[in-house]
Amino acid sequence: MTDTPAKAAQWKQQYNIPDRNIYDYKTFDQLIDNPAIDIVYVVLPNALHAEYVVRAAQAGKHVICEKPLATSVADARRMVAACQKAGKQFSVGYRLHFEPHNQEMMRLGQREAFGPVQHLSANNGFRLSTPSWRVDRALSGGGPLMDMGIYCVQGCLYTKGQVPVSVTAKFIPNPDPKLFKDVEAGIDWQFQFADGATADCRTRYTENMEGRLRAGGPKGWAELMPAFGYGGLAGKTSQNDDRLNLPNINQQAAQMDDFAACILHNRPTRVPGEMGLRDMQLLEAIYRAAETGQKVSTKDVLQLIDRTSAAK
């Protein structure tokens, strides 16, 4: 799917794609007449996710949507409802749920390998110095929280194995009001969990961060650094064992292979659209906490956790 003829010609040759399977945005809805296409993967600027997920579902296709699911909780609900109405599977592009290091963090945390997780910390960000759609709120819906911070949200939840009950947050001072006139330059937040555990997180468009995820309990800790990239992931534990000495893989290939298997074998995806809705609820709560300076309850957030790795 592209409006750029040069790209269409390149991909046609590179991947041996038949002409009938090449579309542009004007012909998108004609997908309904093409049984050769089973899945649509929506990888557009955030504000366009809702429209194209709904249209893909209406065309009778299963859908994967990149993160964040949408730019509002209302749109996220609409997307989930559209896929349910169409009877099609709906998944979020949460590739790290299929990545060995992060899967092991899920297992260690949820199985309480170091006792109940009492504290988590996570950071993720990069230095953005030139204008792009990422700092245009009309397209992005927000700044680094929507882009890089969502990995911290995800990591803390799937490692702790719980959805937080409240959040506090604050925006960092804006170092470049011209560049960051529409979105935050950075934000810090803390999740509070029902058992007293906390998760301290940071995300930035002003700093190349290490992309770290750490979880500690009374008997030790586990850490990934880097935790969220497409390769080079590495981890360690307080016991200096080899539990996080794991291979790096093609994460998105694993993610897409799993979704194909879900469709072929009629089983649910471990990262359903509802998980993206959950995360939009949390992102909105973080923004509300930062804007008001008040602790915001998240007790009404969808209670959904990926327990696949911990169950193995």
Language model regions located:
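Contiguous beta-strand/loop segments that form the cofactor/metal-binding neighborhood of enzyme cores
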Residues: 154-231, 253-267, 284, 301-312
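Beta-loop-alpha module in the N-terminal Rossmann-like domain of NAD(P)-dependent dehydrogenases
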Residues: 20-82
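Rossmann-fold dehydrogenase core element
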Residues: 76-95, 115-122
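NAD(P)-binding Rossmann-fold cofactor-contacting core
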Residues: 1-15
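Hydrophobic residues in well-ordered beta-strands that form the structural core
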Residues: 24, 65, 90-92, 201, ...
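C-terminal helix-rich "cap/oligomerization" subdomain common to oxidoreductases
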Residues: 39, 244, 261-312
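Active-site loop of classical SDR/Rossmann-like NAD(P)-dependent oxidoreductases
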Residues: 3-7, 245-256
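Predominantly a Rossmann-like dinucleotide-binding segment in NAD(P)-dependent oxidoreductases
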Residues: 96-180, 293
